Amino acid sequence: VIIISQSGETADSLAALRLCKENNIRTLGIVNVVGSSIAREADKVFYTLAGPEISVATTKAYSTQLIAAYVLALQFAKIRSEITEEQCDAYVKELKTLPEKIKRILEDKERLQWFASKQANAKDIFFIGRNLDYSMSLEGSLKLKEISYIHSEAYAAGELKHGTISLIEDGTLVVLSLIH
């Protein structure tokens, strides 16, 4: 069982880890805090080493947890011969380009500020996505609520026609994720 926790002290996660231990189930902790309870009690530990979290939205920890899970998935795929060593290396190489891509986004302050100024008075913001994009929509909506205190919800794109669309009115911002 893989247990992911920023602090390594999350009560529900610790309880799950201890239940696994009682039942002789191997555990891997993915944690940020060295020496935390989960780090000490898990059979193996993968440290994200994101450093202290300043933001209430825990953006650094979340990002490093995703990367840790991705790298672990790559290793599983390689061991199971689902991908070759070369493919794995290519995926890791692409992953290493993320810091530069993040830097470019953050440097585009004028466009970000312009957009934010146009949308800051939105009463509601809906994030829409399908499959993996829905997961990203859930996290995007949570981050928006935690940081801006604007009401936000995430919906699976396929559910839009089942009532959700009736919630969209003038002044509602809709963020659609179409990565896949």
What are these regions (language model features)?
Residues V1-A69, L74-A77:
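Phosphate/diphosphate-binding loops
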Residues I179-H180:
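Conserved small/polar residues in nucleotide/adenosyl-binding loops
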